[in-house]
Amino acid sequence: MAALFEENDSYSDSENEEDFSGFLSEIEENENEDEFENDDEFEDDDELENVDELEDDELSSEEVDIPSENEVIVELHDGQAEVEESLLDALLGKALAGDQMNSRIEGLFEDLDSSVEPDIIDRSELEDVDSGISVGAVSSSSAETQASDAKCKNKDAFDMSSLKKYMQYITEEEHAVSVEDIPDFASKKNVYGTSFNVRNGIMSRPPRFEFARHDQRWIDSCVSMAYEKDKTLKELITLGKLTTTVKAGAKIEFRTKFTDVHIRSADEINLMETHDIQQIIRDALNSKRLAVVLFGIGKDGKVTGCHMGPGQQDNLRLALDTAVQTEFAPPIENILDVVDMNFVPVEEMDETFLIVIRVKQLRNQVYRLESSV
């Protein structure tokens, strides 16, 4: 049995015994290298400690002690709590916590660093009278405070007294203006008429009117602008419009090449209709010639004039506008460029004029009157 165990013993010494000395030597060499590296790290730590000691002499804002296991405790002079940081964070924090390398720029961010608290505008100062008109969604008080703080940073940018007057002026209600206080130049607009009950005839809604008026401050400003510069009487006369006049009994001669002249007496204008004026304008436009119609010249060619007051002049202007704007096919465009009317005063005769109607523009268009078709 002993021989059997001896034969099958795998741990027994054999002739081919392996040599492990080489492996042991390599392990010892690695351990020696680790020892040298640890020595280098200790030397580096000693150098860092020396550098920190030099920096502690120069920097007085904070103190940094470097304990073992790469962790430090930073103790600040301003009374903050102790915070554990890594070595890298501690070094960066120490370098950045010292005095600034560049001096502070004067005047930069002074509005943000100001210790003066900005004034808050009271809403009651802006709106003394409630207009009843909503200006938008309701915002929170904090948002209004922030907006007012942003607007009031530069207090000298506007005058509160003028702003208050302006807001008070624009918030006036229409019904606050009485009819007796409205000046003569006020304009009146009927918003809606009177409403009656269809069965009993009782008035259910009175008429409503809106009045527009000029503010006295605006009138005063216009007056000051008008009289800002004084002008002499001669300068004012030169600014006036010179009106051409004609003498009664003067004989008018016509020498026109491209203009047709139509003479009518004062009696004929009383019998003339708009259709007669339309025919003269149509013939002039279709013949590509200018035309002039004179009212107030007798058969002998002398000026007699037509007696017309202001109301009669307006009626004649209305008749001419009606004649040009109707019946023409196609319609005449830019009427004021085609036809005009002038009243030439007759000297030494009151409200007596030589009436001149002119077709002063040619059109590349053939016109017809719808009533003559």
Swiss-Prot record:
The gene is tofu-1. Expressed in the germline. Residues 247-373 are annotated as: SLFN-like fold. It comes from the Eukaryota. The keyword Cytoplasm applies. GO terms for biological process: primary piRNA processing. Component of the trimeric PUCH (precursor of 21U RNA 5'-end cleavage holoenzyme) complex, that acts as an endoribonuclease processing the 5'-end of precursor Piwi-interacting RNAs (piRNAs). The PUCH complex consists of tofu-1, tofu-2 and either slfl-3 or slfl-4, with tofu-2 exhibiting endoribonuclease activity. PUCH-mediated processing strictly requires a 7-methyl-G cap (m7 G-cap) and an uracil at position three (U3). PUCH also exhibits a strict bias for piRNA precursors with an A or G at position 1. Belongs to the Schlafen family. Its main location: cytoplasm. It comes from Caenorhabditis elegans. GO terms for cellular component: cytoplasm; endoribonuclease complex. This is Schlafen-like protein 1. It is found in: Cytoplasm. Keywords: Cytoplasm. In mammalian Schlafen proteins, two SLFN-folds come together to form the nuclease domain. In tofu-1 and tofu-2, only one SLFN-like fold can be identified, suggesting that the two proteins may interact via their SLFN-like folds to form a functional nuclease. Component of the trimeric PUCH (precursor of 21U RNA 5'-end cleavage holoenzyme) complex; consisting of tofu-1, tofu-2 and either slfl-3 or slfl-4; which is required for processing of piRNA precursors. Within the complex, interacts (via N-terminus) with tofu-2 (via N-terminus); the interaction stabilizes tofu-2 and may form a functional nuclease. Within the complex, required for the interaction of tofu-2 (via N-terminus) with slfl-3 (via N-terminus). Residues 1-67 are annotated as: Disordered.
